[in-house]
Amino acid sequence: MKKVMELVDVWKIYDLGEVKVEALRGVSFEVFEGEYVIIIGPSGSGKSTLLHILGCLDRPTKGKVLIEGEEVSRMGDRRLAQVRNRKIGFVFQSYNLLPRLTALENVELPMIYAGVPAKERKRRAKELLELVGLGDRLHHRPNQLSGGQQQRVAIARALANDPVFILADEPTGNLDTKTGEEILELFRKLHEMGKTLVVVTHNLEMVDEGTCIVRIRDGRIEGIERRGVVYGDT
């Protein structure tokens, strides 16, 4: 299997003057193409910090982060922004859609930054919205959509540049049970399509869906389970 991401002995230390906080302590793991990775752990375990490192939104204090074999942890800001735009698709708990743009325009946005021609990006945005079941909501703005529909737009946007992997932060966290199940089904569909998914969640149903479960506690990897094989402490 092709390795799409790797963390090697990653530490994140926050210097708060007299106190140093070790948010991540020697984290190492790999993500392979087509995996459905679920990251779980209690509050304060380092999940949010790990999410930021995985998404190239923050840099490790020490250690390496590699995407498709290329070390990204020491890249300059401009190059790192290109990596985020082209190789990572983000899905946030709060959707993060631009309120003045339509669903179609929100999905087009990452492609504009990537330099995709207007005709092609409109075609692809429409195709992606149809994929997530919103072919009849192309020209609706976020305030005209339900929470579940907004999250579907966010998922379509995440797929816009055909990223190496999708990184999702509590994608069902703001949704009711029924709508959350619909989003869960959509992630299931993406996994079946061969997409690589990395999800931070408390949703136990999502944990059941994952092909790789990463458990984090006190800034360390407590264990990694892959299809019945367990690595690390149990």
From Swiss-Prot:
Organism: Thermotoga maritima (strain ATCC 43589 / DSM 3109 / JCM 10099 / NBRC 100826 / MSB8)
InterPro entries on file: AAA+_ATPase (IPR003593), ABC_transporter-like_ATP-bd (IPR003439), ABC_transporter-like_CS (IPR017871), ABC_transpr_LolD-like (IPR015854), MacB-like_ATP-bd (IPR017911), P-loop_NTPase (IPR027417)
Positions bound to ATP: 41-48
Domain ABC transporter as annotated: residue spans: 5-234
Family annotation (CDD domains): ABC_MJ0796_LolCDE_FtsE
Pfam family, one: ABC_tran
Recorded GO CC terms: plasma membrane
Any one GO molecular-function label of the UniProt entry: ATP binding
SUPFAM superfamilies found in the cross-reference section: P-loop containing nucleoside triphosphate hydrolases
Family stated for the protein in its record: Belongs to the ABC transporter superfamily.
Keywords of this entry: ATP-binding, Nucleotide-binding, Transport
Biological-process GO terms, alphabetical: transmembrane transport
Domain of life, per lineage: Bacteria
Stated name of the protein: Uncharacterized ABC transporter ATP-binding protein TM_0352
